[in-house]
Amino acid sequence: NGKDYRCHIVDCKPIAWLLRSGRNYENILMELLFLLLKDAAFAAIAGVGFGSISNLPKRAFPFCALIAGIGHSLRFFLINYADVHIIWASLAAGLTIGALSVFIGIGIKQPAESLSFPSLLPMIPGMYAYRTFLNLIKCISTRDESTFIHSFYLMSDNLLTGVIIIVMLGIGAVIPIMLFPRIAFGATRNITRY
């Protein structure tokens, strides 16, 4: 029916449009805060889960949850309210996660990579991978040329979007480590190994 169902509570329009719409500012901000906190909470849970299988020490779990929550809610905000494409929002979230991992890693004496990797995993675009393979199966199983072309187009679009999102997340997470190598690689110096 032509509607966009990205958000359920607040209309998915840029913030400027919402503020001009005549709605109460407090209601808009409370709904937005609720959505951001909900998104951050689910990303934090996923970040801790991925951190546990990445063999992070238990003392790093709260920081991994914090980094994952901030990064994912930033991407959610940029996509739904700042009208930024998911690729550029993923780059911004990757940069944020990378920077937070570098500077938090110093305080808890953990490598930035060990904090950023589990925090990035909740943002891997699973829906694009699913749609890629769904349309690949449609391409293989159809005999109609127009259906094949349409399915191939959708498969290519989803594949490219998913791959570019993953690349942007990786680039965004690596840039702060490369910009601050002394800080990033010095976080684990003077740690006795057991």
Spans of model-derived segments:
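C-terminal ends of transmembrane helices
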Residues: I45-L56, A99-P111, I177-R182
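C-terminal membrane-adjacent module
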Residues: T132-Y194
